[in-house]
Amino acid sequence: MIGAVLAGGRGRRFGGDKLLFRISGKPLLLYTIERLEQAEKIDEIVLVASKENAEKLRDFGHDVVVDELMIGPMGGIFTALSLGDAFVVAGDMPLLVPEFIDFIVERFEEAKKPACVPRWSNGYLEPLHAAYSSSFRDFLEERIKSRNYAINQAIRESDACYIEIEKLPEGWRESFFNVNTREDLRRLTPLRTRDNPDTLR
């Protein structure tokens, strides 16, 4: 299973390239990659980039593919699935739980559905922490042609399997945390070094 990291966003709310912002001396994106590398079900990692940041991302040591569409999450997922089945996450999710990723991939393999997506009790989906079949790409292609870029709607109208989040270990929920603003960085205490516990730089 490919681990696809969507890393083509512009980070407008953050005020700069948040994926390269350093936390305890290490780029935010690297935390996401390292957590994904710890998942036993992930065989290789691919970074889905924009044309603008593709060269910078090659420094992270993984294959980089360019999202030519730049229509949001759907375009990134569509691009990733050109390479095969993929577990897709956003690059700004530094608290990924490897065991949770493995759990989702196992459910995906068992269910044999086009997608396997975590779902909250209120119906809210987590499409950027989910497993997708390469066959789902054909379904997305029709959406893209009609300019319907709503990924949650596409998932709901496909024959997806869902993982009920409230039935899982509560500690796994931190896996969904993503950094949108600089204020969000204050929640990243687990990533600070022991020697520099109060420094985010």
UniProtKB/Swiss-Prot annotation:
Membrane-spanning residues: none
Residues that, per the record, bind Mg(2+): 92
GO aspect biological process, one term: Mo-molybdopterin cofactor biosynthetic process
Entry's EC annotation: 2.7.7.77
Gene Ontology CC annotations of this record: cytoplasm
Its job: Transfers a GMP moiety from GTP to Mo-molybdopterin (Mo-MPT) cofactor (Moco or molybdenum cofactor) to form Mo-molybdopterin guanine dinucleotide (Mo-MGD) cofactor.
UniProt-recorded name of the protein: Probable molybdenum cofactor guanylyltransferase
Organism: Thermococcus kodakarensis (strain ATCC BAA-918 / JCM 12380 / KOD1)
Gene encoding the protein: mobA
